[in-house]
Amino acid sequence: SVPYLFNGYYYWSRYEKGYEHPLYLRKKENSEQEEIILDGQKMSEDFEFFNIGDYDVSNDNNIMAYSLDTLSRRIYQIKIKDLISDKLYPETLENTTGSIVFANDNETIFYGKKDPVTLRSFQIYSHKLGTNQSEDVLIFQEDDETFSCYAYKTKSNEYIVINSSSTLSDEYRLIPAGNPLKKPEIFQKRERGLEYNIYHHQDQFYILTNKNHHNFSVETCSKDSTGKENWKEFISGREDVLIEGLDVFDHY
């Protein structure tokens, strides 16, 4: 894969000749010394099926959480690794969606769980490193069976976001990444037919939405007033152009 820079390290994956599973590597920004953080080929040796789903690294660069599917059902275990000692934490998180997000305290991770029957992603939990999964806190449960939910961190590194989506509706909740114990706050309540995605940048959010145009427009709002009544048009919708996505950068 193409290396990407995160918090002073480049991260990428690579297949060695004859390998069925990749190596996951990193190196410091100004160094040529590679560090193998996961050896997929070696890890797969005891399993008939093996797939690494997702991984995330703590803000201090010292801890890695990663997910594994060894059942071929997209039901993942999450394991946590100390990248300094190369040793695993004692706990394993079972029956997850495979998605992982570190809070900025370097000791809390957010992850999703699936409905055991439908395999719909419907719960978001928080886990404190070094504790049993039975002690994890249910942060959000999506009871509407037409919606699925997942958690991620904004590109700004400032918010944990819980997204609930169906075919024609979206709803987001925000948790400050530096305060993972805070109750999630709704960005804009779900409405049938209202689709939107959010992108945080400095003191505001950019919103890609079909609120004012079926081909979507880009709106902005203050991070302190996020309801749709506060959205202001930034890029108008057009009949001849469908806006499919956007990204934000510090210097562009």
Predicted regions and their residues:
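Beta-propeller folds
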Residues: 1-252
